[in-house]
From Swiss-Prot:
Domain I is involved in oligomerization and binding regulators, domain II is flexibile and of varying length in different bacteria, domain III forms the AAA+ region, while domain IV binds dsDNA. One of its GO terms (cellular component) is cytoplasm. InterPro entries: AAA+_ATPase, Chromosome_initiator_DnaA, Chromosome_initiator_DnaA-like, Chromosome_initiator_DnaA_CS, DnaA_C, DnaA_dom, DnaA_N_dom, DnaA_N_sf. The keyword Nuclease does not apply. Residues 131-347 are annotated as: Domain III, AAA+ region. Oligomerizes as a right-handed, spiral filament on DNA at oriC. PANTHER family: CHROMOSOMAL REPLICATION INITIATOR PROTEIN DNAA. This is Chromosomal replication initiator protein DnaA. Keywords: ATP-binding, Cytoplasm, DNA replication, DNA-binding, Lipid-binding, Nucleotide-binding. Its main location: cytoplasm. The gene is dnaA. The keyword Membrane does not apply.
Length: 467
């Protein structure tokens, strides 16, 4: 009964809170107990303290509303329902500040090459270079509300590798700075300890190395490479999906590193529990440390990024010009930087001053989609017809999923395709608050990463509304 009560409570919290907050702090909690006590297990001390400080009051309120009897007493503990395996124990110890386990003496496999790249090799059969980009540092990373928590967590890991949050799991859409943050940690560790053994790579590199090792009968060397590092940084972990043999080997690598107190940082385009065709035991382990979402940057952060990049390129970019680009390019940092590079290149070749008018001409093809004038009324009508509901349903206070999802879709499209502010969009959707619109946009971004049907719907709407 207590378990059912907790699931109902989670449903209310998911509706009330922004997706990032819910996924980071509340979704990882596990519950068990009796009629008198609800025991909540947090994966680490950081989550436990944050839930206790920020959410425990609201949890108590919801539980009291859901039961006619006295609400169960809530206790928070670090751990897991499934018990204390070695890996879990290592995770919990690291979460509460245990000191780094001293690993046996092992050969140095990462050093600084003359070019600044970090070369990583395995003797004999397997050899490849996996490097940290020296420009990806915390100093060159522009902080904003969208990435504030992720940056803070990454800096904690850089200061205390292997004992802060292990693994650190960063997720979010493409081009939002996950790789930059991950490599910033590696560069910070390396700066403090030039003898540190850092290995950064894409998940497909791990798969390719494993296949090569099997072909050359060099699997022991493969395992020695990946298990002898001080920090393992793997990008786009979702590419392990459907690769059963790779998942099996990474599972054992994960356990070996965790038990050795070696740091892991993983990135993904979606929340770990939402990765299809990935073993449950792996998805569970991904959540043992700290899971943080990196969101699309808000306008102020986009402007700051542009100004920073222009400064690094020794190019004068007025705040007016930066604001113009930031208003037009809203999808991700990568596209934003690409647009700026195109503008700078055109200015260099033509000798013209960078102004909003010059930018519009340079980016006319890229901005074509954003320049389409689409009304909120047209968006609401198109979405309602597509999902076979009434416009009145979209504007209503109904919260059933069959109405909520189309409403969130329409709000996200309105933000993407119109120049209306969030309060104006909220007002057009039945007098809702701007935070509701912002939450709807976040939900759509996340669902597009995990739900192919919804992603196709969104792309279809974009085509219909801009054609």
């Amino acid at each position: 009964m207590t378990s059912e009560l907790w699931h109902q409570c989670l449903g209310y919290l998911e509706d009330e809170l922004p997706a990032q907050q819910f996924n980071t702090w509340l979704r990882p909690l596990q519950a068990k107990g009796s009629e008198e006590e609800l025991l909540l297990f947090a994966p680490n001390r950081f989550v436990l303290d944050w839930v206790n400080e920020k959410y425990i009051g609201r949890i108590n309120e919801i539980l009291s509303e859901l039961t006619s009897q006295k609400a169960p007493r809530i206790s928070l503990k670090i751990g897991s329902i499934t018990g204390n395996s070695k890996g879990q124990q290592a995770s919990k110890d690291s979460a509460v500040g245990a000191t780094r386990t001293t690993a046996p003496s092992r050969p140095v496999i990462a050093d600084v090459a003359p070019s600044g790249e970090r070369n990583v090799t395995v003797e004999g059969a397997i050899k490849h270079e996996s490097y940290l980009n020296p420009t990806f540092t915390f100093e060159t990373f522009v902080e904003g509300k969208s990435n504030q928590l992720a940056r803070a967590a990454a800096m904690q890991v850089a200061d205390n590798p292997g004992s802060a949050y292990n693994p650190l799991f960063l997720y979010g859409g493409v081009g939002l700075g996950k790789t930059h943050l991950m490599q910033a940690v590696g560069n910070a560790i390396f700066k403090k300890n030039p003898n540190a053994k850092i290995l950064y790579l894409h998940s497909e590199r791990f798969v390719a190395d494993m296949v090569k090792a099997l072909q050359l009968n060099a699997f022991n060397e493969f395992k020695r490479l990946y298990r002898s590092v001080d920090a393992l940084l793997i990008d786009d972990i979702q590419f392990f999906a459907r690769k059963e043999r790779s998942q099996e080997e990474f599972f054992h690598t994960f356990n070996a590193l965790l038990e050795g107190g070696q740091q892991m940082i993983l990135t993904c385009d979606r929340y770990p529990k939402e990765i299809d065709h990935m073993e449950e035991r792996l998805k569970s382990r991904f959540g043992w440390g700290l899971t943080v979402m990196v969101e699309p940057p808000e306008l102020e952060t986009r402007v700051a990024i542009l100004m920073k990049k222009a400064e690094q390129a020794n190019v004068h970019l007025s705040s007016e010009s930066a604001f113009f680009i930031a208003q037009k390019i809203r999808s991700n940092v990568r596209e934003l930087e690409g647009a700026l590079k195109l503008v700078i290149a055109n200015a260099h070749f033509t000798g013209q001053e960078i102004t909003p008018a010059f930018i519009r001409e340079c980016l006319k093809d890229l901005l074509a989609l954003h320049e389409k004038q689409v009304s909120i009324d047209n968006i609401q009508r198109t979405v309602a017809e597509y999902y076979k509901i009434r416009i009145a349903d979209i504007l209503s206070k109904r919260r059933t999923r069959s109405i909520t999802r189309p409403r969130q879709m329409a709000m996200a499209l309105a933000k993407e395709l119109t120049n209306h502010s969030l309060p104006e969009i909220g007002e057009a959707f039945g007098g809702r608050d701007h935070t509701t619109v912002l939450h709807a946009c976040k939900v759509m971004i996340e669902l597009q990463q995990s739900d192919p049907t919804l992603r196709d719907d969104y792309q279809n709407f974009m085509r219909m509304l801009t054609s």
